[in-house]
Amino acid sequence: EVTRCKWAEGVSLDYIRYHDEEWGVPVHDDRVQFEFLILEGAQAGLSWSTILNKRAGYRKAFADFDPAKVARFTQKRVEKLLQDPSIVRNRLKVESTVTTAKASLAVQEEFGTFSDYIWGVVDGKPIQTRYRRDRDVPATSAESDALSKDLKKRGFRFVGSTIVYAHMQATGLVNDHVTGCFRHRPCARLK
């Protein structure tokens, strides 16, 4: 029996697998960074389990999260996506995915990779926290505030500080596995 972060106990196997295999693991791939930013934004106002359940649908609907392809989506394509039950059919969220794809390509152009830009907020090294209880883990940080502000300035949408902090946690910019969680130490060794 392993000890996990409380939020990953008594949940579906997909949720547990997400906690055990993905959450907090450093991501340096632009496509995966884009995927998580889109999924975190889609989750706004919903449960993460809803998004995990729709993840395959999102991958299919949004060209396997290839930002170059998503950036070329037409309004007609957006309208079609709004009829797709395999994703969250919220107009603002669907349209923001196209906007975010375009903005991420501009960031790639400026910084070399989208990942390098994102990782710049933590100087390229994951922040290692030592929270003992889930309730001690913050919803935002100075880094997420700064990144959120800059993303908004660059035209990204659905990137408030809470969403950005969740993105940072998911993609390993910050290791917020509680110290008693079996994933805390392994994630602390990752770069």
What are these regions (language model features)?
Residues 1-191:
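HhH-family (HhH-GPD) DNA N-glycosylase catalytic core used in base-excision repair
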